């Protein structure tokens, strides 16, 4: 046929049987990738430390999606929350992966069958005997079935009525677990961080989809609307489907990057805005202040800070710190976190407590500046020592650790103080193992960053695809050069341009 690569899909334009076949094959490829990727991730995933080496630090991409839907156990005997399990059941991580691969194989066989047996009676118009699809009816069927699935997910799976529920956590990502969720029917259901909104919105959207599907199955579109929206053209279906997909991709890119109940930080890592706003730092200071108010010592108050909370307050877990084209997991960047060294408190020789100014997200280097409680600069690590007034040596800065592995340890040696001041720019200080994975010390993004970049990019691409195919559908007659209102009988070959009497061919 000699079609260029970008026109090869025209072979299924007027062939409903093979159009169905290629879509089934596409589903086979998607399901096959999902199952294979899950098995690969399970082969390389280390579940031994869910606090300091969680799935998102290891670069897991499909495991978080399985987990948020209620899968927590492995046939390997481990649980995602730590500990061991003796009876994980069929719906373990491996079970879900296997189900996708089996489903992929069945779809592969079905695609081949439909490619071979393409000329089925169901695709033929009874009146003309030619291949034809009743697209408005098919739209109604799909809308009804997707509505049933949507309603079922919200009413049964999420609520735990028939299913495990979903992953639910506290605002600081400390107590996450899979649990049933009650629908939130009040205004709180519109809060993107309220899990109940997931149940209620699926129930509401599913109900609407079922009703809309039944409507489109029982009511035929008016002739003027049918012609105006080109409802008889398969490219209209392509255009509107692309619109639905790019809209969904933009939405999920937003919920992933800005955070929501559907993208828990325990599964996908924290958002960049939590670093920008000092979200975890504020909660840590609130807990320490509460401890001091209960007459605890500084050491006791800091020792009660969960290591998990301290780890979130570290810039290496900020998804915006990794370049988009730096391949590999976060562990391949700054290393595998081994332990929290504790919270460093700096003081000058007059006893004032000093705070290291933290590095903003989009800086690779940042001056080391220590300020007092009023924000006045008291010490720094100068670029030019000859002109320095506030150097650590001149000001006599010391550092003492509270909580963590170095609890109670203090340093007055300027070189050591400066080392920890530099590290305090990056948030809480952790011991990182860079030897095991030969980590290069350059920050990487988390799966939250990859997902957002991928979906935003494809959404933009699909937006242009929607415009392209929509225009081709609506203006097909213009592009073809045929007047749609032409009702005269035209003899093919009589004119150089079809239907244009001014281009009548001259007799040879």
UniProtKB/Swiss-Prot annotation:
GO cellular component, one term: photosystem II
Keyword hit for Plastid: yes
InterPro entries hit by this protein: PS_antenna-like, PS_II_antenna-like_sf, PSII_PsbB
Entry keyword annotation includes Chloroplast: yes
Transmembrane segment boundaries: 21-36, 101-115, 140-156, 203-218, 237-252, 457-472
Superkingdom of source: Eukaryota
PANTHER family, per database record: PHOTOSYSTEM II CP43 REACTION CENTER PROTEIN, PHOTOSYSTEM II CP47 REACTION CENTER PROTEIN
Subunit structure, as described in the record: PSII is composed of 1 copy each of membrane proteins PsbA, PsbB, PsbC, PsbD, PsbE, PsbF, PsbH, PsbI, PsbJ, PsbK, PsbL, PsbM, PsbT, PsbX, PsbY, PsbZ, Psb30/Ycf12, at least 3 peripheral proteins of the oxygen-evolving complex and a large number of cofactors. It forms dimeric complexes.
Function: One of the components of the core complex of photosystem II (PSII). It binds chlorophyll and helps catalyze the primary light-induced photochemical processes of PSII. PSII is a light-driven water:plastoquinone oxidoreductase, using light energy to abstract electrons from H(2)O, generating O(2) and a proton gradient subsequently used for ATP formation.
Stated name of the protein: Photosystem II CP47 reaction center protein
Species this protein is from: Nicotiana tabacum (Common tobacco)
